[in-house]
Amino acid sequence: MLLRAAGCWRAAASRPGPVWLRGAEHRGLPLASRRLGLPLPLPLAAGGRRLRSGCGALPEVASFQGVAVRSLSTSAPSDHPEHGRLVYKGNLAKAVLGVRFFSYSTSIFNLFMAPYLMLKTGIGFDSLFLQAAFYGLIGFFTFVTPVTLHILTKGYVIRLYYKEEMDTYTAITYNAILAEKATVFHQKDVKIPDITKMFTTFYAKTKSMLVNPTLFPDPQDYNRLMGYDKAFCFDFEEEEKDGESK
């Protein structure tokens, strides 16, 4: 009987175990740890760190995922030490700069190359009217186009800062030589035009400014700039007097 029982025990040990047991054997490490009497590795917690056991803390694994997330979420500082907090940034700044630079380049090219081409090719007009028309056309593309572009885009706000300590706004625009120009003003200096204009959103003192309201990250900054956060007061007596005078 003892021999028969020993033979059955050996046969049972030689047969493959259940599916979940064979999967554990394929993984190797937990089964080898059980055979050698070693403690099983603890599971990983969130962030790639080992859980603490009852006997002490195991070495922690550095979390590269957290470092990557922090590096991606870190953005360039948007505050200016002199102008304050950045509240607006135009998305057409590079386009405006590129168009005006191209216009200046072509104007300079025409200014220097037109006389040279006329001398080399011998182009001439007997009629005074044709000469005036020809030189007027060259002058238009040489001088009028850059001046027109400057007038249309000189009020385009590249960046707008707000300094809470001084309650001042600083608008950055391009000047005639394509350099950045800072205009400092208060909210009380902002005047909204009575008639909607294509290239003017508001006036800062006497200078026209063009901004896109949808590009303000915080709509409250736009409301504060335009004075929409203030209560509107209507003087009905003055309205009646104006109506009677008419």
From Swiss-Prot:
The UniProt entry lists the main location of this chain as mitochondrion
GO MF term set: mitochondrial proton-transporting ATP synthase complex binding
Q: Which GO terms describe its cellular component?
A: mitochondrial inner membrane; mitochondrial membrane
TM spans (from-to) = 97-119, 132-152
Q: Which Pfam family, just one, is annotated for this protein?
A: TMEM70
**Topology in membrane:** Multi-pass membrane protein
Presequence positions on this chain: 1-79
Q: Which residues lie on this side of the membrane: Mitochondrial intermembrane?
A: 120-131
| Lineage top rank: taxon | Eukaryota
Mitochondrial matrix face residues: 80-96, 153-246
Query: What keywords is this UniProt entry annotated with?
Result: Membrane, Mitochondrion, Mitochondrion inner membrane, Transit peptide, Transmembrane, Transmembrane helix
The subcellular localization recorded is: Mitochondrion inner membrane
Which terms under GO biological process does the entry name?
A: mitochondrial proton-transporting ATP synthase complex assembly; protein complex oligomerization
Q: Which PANTHER family match?
A: TRANSMEMBRANE PROTEIN 70, MITOCHONDRIAL
Q: Give the UniProt family note.
A: Belongs to the TMEM70 family.
Primary role: Scaffold protein that participates in the c-ring assembly of mitochondrial ATP synthase (F(1)F(0) ATP synthase or complex V) by facilitating the membrane insertion and oligomer formation of the subunit c/ATP5MC1. Therefore, participates in the early stage of mitochondrial ATP synthase biogenesis and also protects subunit c/ATP5MC1 against intramitochondrial proteolysis.
Q: Please give the name of this protein.
A: Transmembrane protein 70, mitochondrial
Gene for this protein?
A: TMEM70
